[in-house]
Design a protein with these regions (language model features):
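Helix-loop junctions and terminal segments of transmembrane helices
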Residues: 41, 45-89, 136-141
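Alpha-helical transmembrane segments of polytopic membrane transporters and translocases
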Residues: 7, 22-24, 34-53, 83-87, ...
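Helix-terminus/linker motif at the lipid-water interface of multi-pass membrane proteins
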Residues: 16-47, 62-66, 101-111
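Residue-level recognition of pore/gate-forming positions within transmembrane alpha-helices
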Residues: 16, 43-46, 93, 102, ...
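Residues that define the loop-to-transmembrane-helix transition and helix capping
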Residues: 33-36, 79, 113-116, 145-146, ...
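Membrane-interface helix-loop junctions in multi-pass transport and translocation proteins
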Residues: 146, 153-179
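Interhelical loop/hinge segments that connect adjacent transmembrane helices in multipass membrane
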Residues: 1-20, 33, 59-76
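Alpha-helical transmembrane segments of multi-pass membrane transport and lipid-handling proteins
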Residues: 78-130, 159-168
Length: 179
């Protein structure tokens, strides 16, 4: 149990670092106004995909663990959950990207309109986040915390390298690379 759990702990530490490194780099190389625009866009995007992800994860993990002994059944259930997740996530997040300008003006006033392009990029990325969480739950339910950990570490290192290479290109390019 300890080897499995320790790998999940390491994975969660990398997730935490990876989730916060972008803001740290923005604060170091850009103005506080630019960081504020990114933070505002990220806040609204996170609310959107977190609502969907939390709803799906609350159901998927127990179901996938319960069906882990029957690979064919788990595969069929996973496919159904994946379709359902895409059915909810894509219209919600792409819709939020489409109405981002109006949403920002209504929610936090027109002074934050500069965050709209960043929010649109993050919303497109956010449509896929619940699906990646589904695959993570599948790996964990199959007891493959080692694969999950190394995948997360590799992804984090690639993202950090790409961010460092694109710092001079601007926040929009960094947001595309980071997502």
């Amino acid at each position: 149990m300890l080897p499995f759990s320790s790998k999940l702990l390491i994975t969660n530490v990398f997730h935490y670092i990876n989730d916060n490194i972008f803001s740290v780099l923005l604060g170091r190389f850009y103005t506080s106004q630019d960081v504020g625009y990114y933070t505002q866009a990220n806040k609204w995007t996170n609310m959107g995909f977190s609502l969907i992800s939390n709803m799906i994860n609350g159901v998927s993990q127990p179901v996938l663990v319960e069906t882990s002994s029957d690979a064919m059944r788990q595969k069929n259930i996973f496919r159904k959950m994946l379709r359902f997740t895409a059915f909810i996530s894509f219209p919600a997040m792409f819709g939020l990207a489409l109405i981002a300008n109006e949403f920002i003006v209504i929610a936090v006033t027109a002074k934050w309109q500069a965050c709209v392009p960043i929010m649109q990029i993050l919303c497109i990325w956010g449509a896929f986040v619940p699906i990646t969480y589904m695959y993570s739950n599948l790996l964990i339910s199959k007891g493959k915390s080692n694969l999950f950990m190394w995948n997360t570490i590799a992804q984090s290192l690639v993202q950090l390298t790409m961010l460092l290479c694109t710092i001079s290109q601007g926040i929009l390019v960094m947001a595309v690379i980071y997502t």
